[in-house]
């Protein structure tokens, strides 16, 4: 009887050991696969005209976030050469090698007509992701296809760098959960033209009840000052945020999490609803409401 019990215990131990080994092997394989095949992100920090001091810090932060999470590998460029599907010399990467492109740019980048066509096609037709940060909305302001893709263009920053009163309009979107419903962040927020919330999913907007609407540079009369949005462009996913002008903000965990989730979403590592929604007018933050504050 004792001998049979020992045999049964040994068998049970062996079965458990084998099961645990299988789990470990599976986990190791999954980890190795993840480490061996991160997504590829191209970050462009080229500016023509005004130079933003935060660009270098932002690029370094985005590279670090990808490396630390293991989710993406980052290629940093301060030129536009890689924005093409054409084979480049010296084994340089082109758009075909990336899952998403991030712009912290400004002005008319040095791209010929074929590069522009390749860039738009890579998002609209190939389904690659695009993330636009801050001055990406002052890029190619005379190129309608780019404006249609990103969702809007810069039209002054009436309040310059100020304590911006921000409302999180869609707390369910990845990267919004860490923010309170309303908060203040010192940054430079753009007023937008060629923008319509009918074409985007607004994630953050300014609280107009706390703005100086008598500022002579205020052009919008609808009270819709979007700060961050997401949208589809053909097959591609597009994300834009006006945040990022202030260098120190790139050290804030909340902003880093927002950018991480934005990149993940554009790379299809997460999903979210980007159906457009009307400007809320039934909450205490809307100036037309009797409880506005």
Positions of PLM-derived features:
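A glycine-rich, often tryptophan-bearing local segment used as a flexible ligand/cofactor-contacting loop or short
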Residues: 108-181
């Amino acid at each position: 009887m004792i001998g049979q019990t020992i045999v049964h215990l040994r068998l049970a131990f062996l079965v458990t050991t084998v099961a645990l080994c299988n789990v470990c092997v599976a986990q190791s394989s999954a980890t190795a696969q993840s480490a061996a095949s991160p997504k590829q992100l191209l970050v462009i920090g080229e500016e023509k005209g005004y130079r933003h001091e935060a660009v270098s810090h932002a690029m370094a932060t985005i590279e670090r976030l990808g490396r630390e999470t293991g989710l993406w590998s980052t290629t940093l460029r301060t030129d536009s050469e890689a924005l093409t599907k054409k084979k480049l010399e010296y084994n340089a990467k082109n758009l075909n090698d990336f899952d998403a492109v991030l712009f912290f740019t400004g002005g008319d980048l040095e791209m010929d007509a074929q590069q522009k066509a390749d860039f738009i096609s890579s998002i609209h037709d190939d389904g690659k992701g695009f993330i636009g940060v801050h001055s990406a909305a002052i890029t190619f302001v005379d190129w309608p296809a780019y404006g249609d893709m990103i969702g809007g263009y810069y039209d002054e920053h009436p309040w310059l760098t100020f304590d911006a009163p921000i409302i999180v309009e869609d707390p369910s979107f990845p990267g919004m959960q860490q923010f309170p419903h309303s908060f203040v962040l010192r940054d430079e927020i753009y007023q937008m033209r060629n923008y319509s919330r009918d074409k985007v999913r607004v994630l953050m907007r300014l609280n107009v009840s706390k703005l100086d609407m008598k500022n002579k540079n205020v052009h919008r009369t609808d009270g819709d000052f979007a700060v961050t949005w997401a949208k589809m462009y053909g097959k591609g996913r597009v994300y834009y945020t006006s945040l990022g002008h202030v260098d120190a903000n790139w050290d804030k965990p909340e902003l880093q999490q927002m950018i991480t989730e934005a990149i993940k979403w554009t790379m299809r590592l997460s999903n979210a609803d980007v159906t457009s929604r009307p400007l809320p007018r039934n909450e205490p933050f809307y100036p037309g409401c009797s409880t506005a504050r």
